[in-house]
C-alpha cells in the first residue's frame, strides 16, 4: 500500500510502511548490524524534518530510499574518518529446531554482505535497489541521481562482479579444509 501523495503522511505511517525496507537497505549498503538501529533512526529523523517539504514528484518510497542512501553514505564516510573497519559481527550461537539450515542462511547472508561491501557505492546502490529491493530502474535512477542508461550500466557491471565473487565464494566453500 503506497501512501497517497496529495496529503502529507505522518512519520509514524511512513515508518510503519517503510521501516523494514529501510532496515534491509541499510544493511545491504554496508551499515554494520550493531549500528543499523542508530542509522535507521537518523533516516527517520531526516524524514520527519523534511516530510512537510515532500512534493510528491516521486513516490514516497523512492523519496525515503534517497534519504536512506545518503544517510548510509554519510555513515560509511564517518566510519572511514574514524578509521573503523566495517566488518561482520562475531558469529552467534545458533539455537533453532533446524540449526544447519539457520547456519547456512546466516552464512549465505554474510557472503552476500561481503560481496556487496566489495562493490563501489554507485554499483552497490543500484544493485541493492534493483535486484534486492525490486525498484524499477527509473525509480532507482531517480533515487541515486543518475541517467537511466548509467543506471543500467552500473547494474550490468555490478551483476558481473557479484557473479564473479559468488563463484569464487562457492569455490572457496567447496575446498576441503
Task: Please name every model-derived segment.
Residues 126-130:
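A short pre-motif secondary-structure segment
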Residues 82-105, 109, 136:
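Internal acidic/polar
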Residues 2-24, 37, 48:
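A short, charge-rich alpha-helical start-of-domain segment used by transcription regulators
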Residues 2-5, 31, 42-59, 78-80:
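Sigma70-family region 2
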Residues 3, 117, 121-122, 133-150, ...:
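Helix-turn-helix DNA-binding module
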Residues 53-55, 66-87, 105, 168-170:
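Arg/Lys-rich amphipathic alpha helix in sigma70-family domain 2
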Residues 56, 77, 119, 159-177:
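Short, Lys/Arg-enriched C-terminal cap helix and immediately downstream tail that follows
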Residues 19, 44-48, 58-78, 155, ...:
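Σ70-family region 2.3-2.4 aromatic/basic alpha-helix that recognizes the −10 promoter
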Amino acid at each position: 500500500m503506497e501512501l497517497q501523495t496529495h496529503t502529507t503522511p505522518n512519520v509514524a505511517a511512513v515508518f510503519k510502511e517503510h521501516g523494514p525496507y529501510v532496515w534491509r537497505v541499510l544493511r545491504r549498503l554496508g551499515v554494520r548490524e550493531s549500528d543499523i538501529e542508530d542509522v535507521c533512526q537518523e533516516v527517520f529523523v531526516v524524514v520527519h524534518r523534511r516530510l512537510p517539504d515532500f512534493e510528491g514528484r516521486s513516490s514516497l518510497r523512492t523519496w525515503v530510499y534517497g534519504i536512506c542512501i545518503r544517510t548510509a553514505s554519510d555513515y560509511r564516510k564517518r566510519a572511514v574518518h574514524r578509521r573503523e573497519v566495517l566488518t561482520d559481527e562475531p558469529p552467534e550461537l545458533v539455537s533453532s529446531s533446524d540449526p544447519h539450515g539457520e547456519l547456512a542462511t546466516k552464512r549465505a547472508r554474510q557472503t552476500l554482505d561481503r560481496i556487496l561491501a566489495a562493490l563501489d557505492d554507485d554499483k552497490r546502490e543500484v544493485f541493492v535497489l534493483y535486484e534486492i529491493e525490486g525498484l524499477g530502474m527509473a525509480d532507482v535512477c531517480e533515487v541515486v541521481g543518475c541517467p537511466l542508461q548509467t543506471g543500467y550500466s552500473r547494474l550490468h557491471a555490478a551483476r558481473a562482479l557479484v557473479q564473479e565473487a559468488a563463484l569464487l565464494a562457492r569455490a572457496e566453500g567447496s575446498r576441503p579444509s
